[in-house]
């Protein structure tokens, strides 16, 4: 299939070439960029809607500002695909999120045009402020621009940064990309005119002169003059909140109209003082009818047909872990009206959209605010409710102090369903669920579980619902289950007790999480090599099943712990117990298989687990090495001594 014709885009592979184009060519360039983006993402999948919404803004920014000397920071990074195309990466744009290809987010190691990496929300203003202050300290004259969506503005970190920027009076430009029209819609030509007016030097010079005059007036007249000016500007343009934080507010303006964007950006670029916020209103999915009609479905997409918009989805023979969690929680909530659910802006991603349909008054979406979500859940628990605070593993990191201080220390029974545990593939290291076992199992009194399959997940939902002695968590991966039979309702598991799923005599494989299937496959191969193998499902990283571990250690020559987490997690806790209990004193060969002590780049999950040695082959190889056997399982002969 031939690619679309893009003559202007072909002439502007980098921002310096883009800046050489006349302004009248920029609308056509934007259309070609949009066409290229749609075609590229149709072949790779990825985040489409947000990028389509900032095409004109991206063109305008790189045309007005001297990148990469001037810094542009894209919050989250979902909207950065057009930026990548315009900054020398067009030839690799069809490798997005593929192994060895471009990251789906901004990444410092990838390009000098990515001054700050991102993937989690609401970091851009803080990073931009740090860069702006560094520029001032160095005597530089560079511009620093942070582009942040209205969704990301729901996080407290954004306001902390703005409050600090206003106090420092730093020269920082924040562009609020309002793509849900959730703050204020543009008001047409009058809005554009006012935006140009108030962003210009003349207006700001007159304003500063008026302030100087006002300072000579009595205090009560100074206050009246200030309030009158603020009221007049707020009446026409909005932005009172941002002004109170110390920002000079400009907008709202149409983010798809280059005639509106360019003069405002130039005016702000040429301003030499203080933080400025430009309120730009855009439309997610702009210029592609299917994405405009269903923005939620085109936020993140699989490969799709450009003509029809139909996404290619592999047939699912079994339900996803996320869906199993959602349906299991609904079942428990039917039996217990104290069960409530909390999500931090991820109802669909966590399966709580299903719960919300069944119990709309018992689900709470608190926005991108994981810290608040955790403490809000703690408050619910303190009043006798049973909150399930469902957060991705990678995002739970953002609320860890609240987990410790507000939940764990007070021993409040908050339930933490932890989705996206382990590796997540195309989203790479920023979204990998590597650390939750380590940082939760370190907390006194915290119950930490991991589901080995979808039936176990159903049991753990029931167990968490019934457990009122303190905080409890259960982790599960992205993707579909393994196809085991599901009970109609989960059973209550005995806290701190695992299970034997295969009996053997020589080797013991102790799995925590969904690597259990790989352990069973490895046991088959080891058995074929004459090594009788036990496979156990730990279920709990805390409290550990001491009786099970003692049995495995005493009755086997080799013990291998396997988990989908970083060093310092389940395996470390088992080793600590083995050492303390004296179980290492008799020559037991122990190995702990974890994710490697690196941030693994994006790729296919199966390939990434193989790289980590957490697949069947890696487990078998580890056992053979412990027993001094070669890759075929034969006992290695000692190297002959030579004088």
UniProtKB/Swiss-Prot annotation:
Binding site for Mg(2+): 150, 179
GO molecular function: 1-deoxy-D-xylulose-5-phosphate synthase activity; magnesium ion binding; thiamine pyrophosphate binding
Keyword Magnesium (UniProt): yes
Any Gene Ontology biological process: terpenoid biosynthetic process
Catalytic activity, EC: 2.2.1.7
Keywords, alphabetical: Isoprene biosynthesis, Magnesium, Metal-binding, Thiamine biosynthesis, Thiamine pyrophosphate, Transferase
Sequence positions that bind thiamine diphosphate: 78, 119-121, 151-152, 179, 288, 370
Entry keyword annotation includes Magnesium: yes
Cofactor requirement: Mg(2+); thiamine diphosphate
Top EC class for this record: transferase
Pathway in which the depicted protein is active: Metabolic intermediate biosynthesis; 1-deoxy-D-xylulose 5-phosphate biosynthesis; 1-deoxy-D-xylulose 5-phosphate from D-glyceraldehyde 3-phosphate and pyruvate: step 1/1
Catalytic reactions of this protein: D-glyceraldehyde 3-phosphate + pyruvate + H(+) = 1-deoxy-D-xylulose 5-phosphate + CO2
Cofactor binding, per record: Binds 1 Mg(2+) ion per subunit. Binds 1 thiamine pyrophosphate per subunit.
InterPro entries noted in UniProt: Dxylulose-5-P_synthase (IPR005477), THDP-binding (IPR029061), Transketo_C/PFOR_II (IPR009014), Transketolase-like_Pyr-bd (IPR005475), Transketolase_BS (IPR020826), Transketolase_C (IPR033248), Transketolase_CS (IPR049557)
Disulfide bonds listed in the record: none
Coiled coil: none
Gene3D superfamilies for the chain: 3.40.50.920, 3.40.50.970
PANTHER family referenced in this protein's UniProt entry, alphabetically: 1-D-DEOXYXYLULOSE 5-PHOSPHATE SYNTHASE-RELATED (PTHR43322), 1-DEOXY-D-XYLULOSE-5-PHOSPHATE SYNTHASE, CHLOROPLASTIC (PTHR43322:SF5)
Stated role: Catalyzes the acyloin condensation reaction between C atoms 2 and 3 of pyruvate and glyceraldehyde 3-phosphate to yield 1-deoxy-D-xylulose-5-phosphate (DXP).
Family stated for the protein in its record: Belongs to the transketolase family. DXPS subfamily.
Record text on subunit structure and interactions: Homodimer.
Annotated NCBIfam families: dxs, PRK05444.2-2
Protein name as annotated: 1-deoxy-D-xylulose-5-phosphate synthase
Source organism (scientific name): Brucella canis (strain ATCC 23365 / NCTC 10854 / RM-666)
Gene behind this protein: dxs
């Amino acid at each position: 299939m031939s690619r679309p014709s893009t003559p202007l885009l072909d002439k502007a592979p980098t921002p310096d070439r883009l800046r050489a184009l006349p302004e009248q060519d920029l609308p056509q360039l934007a259309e070609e960029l949009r066409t290229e983006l749609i075609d590229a993402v149709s072949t790779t999948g990825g985040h489409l809607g947000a990028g389509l919404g900032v095409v004109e803004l991206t063109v305008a920014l790189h045309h007005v500002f001297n990148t990469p000397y001037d810094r542009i920071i894209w919050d989250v990074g979902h909207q950065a695909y057009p930026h990548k195309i315009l900054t020398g990466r067009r030839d690799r744009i069809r490798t997005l999120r593929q192994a060895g290809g471009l990251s789906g987010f901004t990444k410092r190691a990838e390009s000098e045009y990515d001054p700050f990496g991102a993937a989690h929300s609401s970091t851009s203003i803080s990073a931009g402020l740090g860069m702006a202050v560094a520029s001032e300290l160095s005597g530089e004259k560079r511009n620093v621009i942070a582009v942040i969506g209205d969704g990301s503005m729901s996080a407290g970190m954004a306001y902390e940064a703005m409050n600090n920027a206003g106090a420092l009076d730093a020269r920082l430009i924040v562009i609020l990309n309002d793509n849900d029209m959730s703050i204020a819609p543009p008001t047409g030509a009058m809005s554009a005119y006012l935006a140009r007016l108030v962003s210009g030097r003349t207006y700001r010079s007159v304003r500063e002169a008026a302030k100087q005059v006002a300072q000579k007036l009595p205090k009560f007249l100074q206050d009246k003059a200030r309030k009158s000016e603020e009221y007049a500007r707020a009446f026409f343009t909005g932005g009172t909140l941002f002004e109170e934080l110390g920002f000079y507010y400009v907008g709202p303006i149409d983010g798809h109209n280059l005639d509106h964007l360019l003069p405002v950006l130039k005016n702000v670029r040429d301003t030499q003082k203080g933080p400025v916020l430009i309120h730009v209103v855009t439309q997610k999915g702009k210029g592609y009818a299917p994405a405009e009609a269903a923005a939620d479905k085109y936020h993140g997409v699989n490969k799709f047909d450009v003509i029809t918009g139909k996404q290619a989805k592999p047939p699912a023979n079994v339900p996803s872990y996320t869906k199993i969690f959602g349906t299991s929680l609904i079942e428990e909530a039917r039996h217990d009206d104290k069960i409530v659910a909390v999500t931090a802006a991820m109802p669909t991603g966590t399966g709580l959209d299903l719960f919300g349909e069944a119990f709309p008054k018992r689900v709470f979406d608190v926005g991108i605010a994981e810290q608040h979500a955790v403490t809000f859940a703690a408050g619910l628990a303190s009043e006798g409710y049973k909150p399930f605070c469902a957060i991705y593993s990678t995002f739970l990191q953002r609320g860890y102090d609240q987990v410790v201080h507000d939940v764990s220390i007070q021993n409040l029974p908050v339930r933490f369903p932890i989705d996206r545990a382990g590796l997540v593939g195309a989203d790479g290291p920023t979204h990998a669920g590597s650390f939750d076992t380590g940082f939760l199992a370190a907390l006194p009194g915290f119950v930490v579980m991991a589901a080995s399959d979808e039936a176990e997940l159903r049991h753990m939902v029931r167990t968490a619902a019934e457990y009122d002695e303190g905080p409890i968590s259960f982790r599960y991966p992205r993707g579909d289950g393994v196809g085991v039979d599901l009970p109609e309702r989960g059973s209550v598991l005995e806290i701190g007790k695992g299970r034997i799923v295969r009996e053997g005599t020589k080797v013991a494989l102790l799995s925590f999480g969904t690597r259990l299937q790989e352990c069973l496959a490895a046991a088959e191969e080891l058995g074929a090599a004459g090594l009788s193998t036990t496979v156990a499902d730990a279920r709990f990283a805390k409290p550990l099943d001491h009786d099970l571990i003692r049995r495995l250690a005493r009755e086997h020559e080799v013990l291998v712990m396997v988990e989908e987490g970083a060093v310092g997690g389940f395996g470390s806790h088992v080793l600590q117990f083995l050492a303390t209990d004296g179980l290492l004193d008799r020559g037991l060969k122990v190995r702990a298989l974890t994710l490697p002590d690196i941030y693994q780049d994006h790729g296919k999950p199966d390939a990434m687990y193989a790289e980590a040695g957490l697949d069947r082959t890696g487990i078998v190889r580890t056992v053979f090495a412990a027993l001094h056997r070669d890759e075929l399982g034969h006992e290695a002969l000692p190297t002959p001594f030579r004088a």
